[in-house]
Structure formats: C-alpha cells, structure tokens
C-alpha cells in the first residue's frame, strides 16, 4: 500500500482505510506491506503493526512535494526489494509513478481520492497537475477505486471510466463516555467538529457561526494539519472562550467517546469522498 502517511493511522481517511483494510487482509493470511511517513522522527514507527509490515521512508517536508517524494522513494524500494503480487496506490496524484509499476508487470489498483483540484490550497499549476494526474490514473491503472458514489459518477462522466465503488464503513463502538471527564466534558454537554484543518472542511465557518450564536454549551474542535499555520491562526482568531481547541486526538477510544457524547456534530467537508469522521 503506497501513497499515504501510512500506519498507525494518525492523519485522515486514507490512513484509516489502510489500517482497516490492511489488518483485515493480514488476518486472512495475506502479506501486507505499508509504506509510511513518520511525523515524529525521534520515535521510530513499529516494523510490524496489526499484522502489516511497515516500511518507514523519508519525504521532503514541503506541501507540494511531500507526497510525491515519499511515493517515489516507496516505488524504488518496492521494485528493488519486494516485487509484490499487486500494488494498491492511494491518490491519483501519484499516477506519474504508475508506468514504473506497469513496466515491472505489477498490477495496480488506484484509489483515486476526491476532487483534489478543487481544493483552495492549490494554485492554478497545482490544479492543472491534479487534472492531468486523474487522466493518467485512468489510463495506467488496472482498476480504479472510489469511496463515494459522487466520485464514481465524476470518473464515469469525465473519462467514461468504470470504478469499483468501495464505500467506507465505521465500527460499532460501545457507547461509553466515562473518559470525557479527562477533558472536563459531560455527555450531551457540548457541540463537536472533527476535521483536518483544510479550507474546504470549513472549520473556520463552523467556529464563526458558533461564536455568533447564543449557544451556552462549548464547541469542541478536534483537528490539525501540517502546513496549515495560517488557517489554524484564523480558526483561533474566530474562537471565543466557549470554544475548546484540542488539536489532533489520536487516542481512538477517547475520540470515539467524544463522538458518542456530543449533543451536535458539525460537518463542513465539501471536497473529497466519504469522510470517516462523518461515519463515526
């Protein structure tokens, strides 16, 4: 599995999908290899995680190059040392590397992600790149995977390309809320938004709308993102004393309890496929 931050899942939907799908494949006896990036250089990633072999490789710490540089390193490692039965590539933006896999006669399934060219963080050049990468993914993949019907419809209409629609799921979790006290919260006593701090997820809009309201219960905001300092400052500037900015919460049990105990969940995502935070 190539093209994301990998496992353990500590970032977004792709990483959650890899963890959930990868561990199930491993449980069925498949040998699963996940290429991963490490957000904490001082703490090495585990070499084996939930039955999956983890290969930690470096990446250029620049928004426009981080994914591509890591995917390129992953492809080189894969071709030299692994040569798998199949490669599962995440994100159509990684399609420039698909010819190398095809030349090695490795079947490729590409999870196309959402309509990345619509994201405001990319300028005209980035948007053109994403559109071209989508077309390349259609030509060079043995199979295309979409996680939402809208994405499948887009590829059918834009490229006359069939996709395998594999919708995300969400686990049924116990309805415990005992750990909310760690955050000085009570079940039913707060509003919640969980999102990566991207413009299209509209965390700032949610916070702005909340602070303009007469709501008495606090708004708990869970989320962060690399390269999002300016956007984070905007969210912080809109918040008042009723807004609790927790940053990223990677303790899954605690996060599940936050979902369970929320009076209202606010979801502002406007680009992409199915979002795991909404399903939960």
Language-model features: where?
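Nucleotide-activated donor-binding/catalytic signature segment of Leloir-type glycosyltransferases, i.e.
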Residues: 232-253
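An aromatic- and histidine-rich active-site surface loop
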Residues: 68-80, 84-113, 117, 273
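Acidic donor-binding loop of glycosyltransferase active sites
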Residues: 257-273
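Conserved donor-binding/catalytic core segment of Leloir-type glycosyltransferases
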Residues: 181-214, 220
